[in-house]
Structure formats: structure tokens, C-alpha cells
A protein has these predicted regions:
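Nucleic acid-binding interface residues in structured DNA/RNA-binding domains
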Residues: 1-112
Length: 112
């Protein structure tokens, strides 16, 4: 069943509200954000972040394995250091990833 434009807009607002609620030093994956909103649409979360995430803490939403958003690794690293987000050095890619097991945010209340 296709979503209406209004439903897509509501989903985008829900994504951004949830991302805004992630505390400094913590992260979620695209899949986590989708699941917390009752969806399996992790790619749709990525689309929302790409199109509308600039004014939101976009660096707190990661690819699987704790990898920062593609193309934004250096800018994300600055935020991670400023927020004391736990990082792990890697020999490949951008040279680091977020220690997802430690930094993953588990909200005490489900999103509304």
C-alpha cells in the first residue's frame, strides 16, 4: 500500500523528533530509529536525514556497525569528540567507528 504525501511528512517529522531526543554521547542506527517508530523502513530514515537532517543531530544516527554517515565522517568525528561519544579505532574506512554497544541509546519511554 502506497503512503500518502501526508503520511510521509508525518513519518519525517517523527524521525526528526526522535533524533532530536537522542542525548549527547549516544547514538541509534537507522534501523533502530525506524523500529522505534513501528517501521522497518531504515532506508526511509536515511532519506529523511539526508533531506532534512541538517538542523538536527544527524551524527547521532549511524550505519550498521557504528559507522558514521558516509561522506560526513570528519564532521561527525568532531561532534563525537565534543560529546565524548565512545569511539573505536579501525584499520579501514575513516579510521574509527562509534562503539555502538556502549553508545546505543535505550530510551526509558517509547517515542510518542
Amino acid at each position: 500500500m502506497a503512503r500518502s504525501a501526508g503520511a510521509g511528512h508525518e513519518f519525517a517529522l517523527d524521525v526528526l523528533d526522535l533524533v532530536d531526543s537522542i542525548p549527547p554521547g549516544h547514538v541509534l542506527s537507522y534501523g533502530d530509529v525506524a523500529a522505534m517508530l513501528g517501521s522497518r523502513a531504515s532506508r526511509a530514515v536515511g532519506t529523511v536525514m539526508r533531506q532534512s537532517g541538517a538542523g538536527h543531530p544527524w551524527w547521532r544516527v549511524l550505519r550498521s556497525g557504528g559507522h558514521p554517515p558516509t561522506g560526513h565522517e570528519a564532521r561527525a568525528h568532531e561532534h563525537y569528540v565534543a560529546e565524548s561519544t565512545p569511539l573505536v579505532r579501525t584499520a579501514t574506512g575513516c579510521g574509527y567507528r562509534v562503539d555502538y554497544a556502549v553508545a546505543r541509546w535505550i530510551p526509558t519511554e517509547p517515542p510518542t
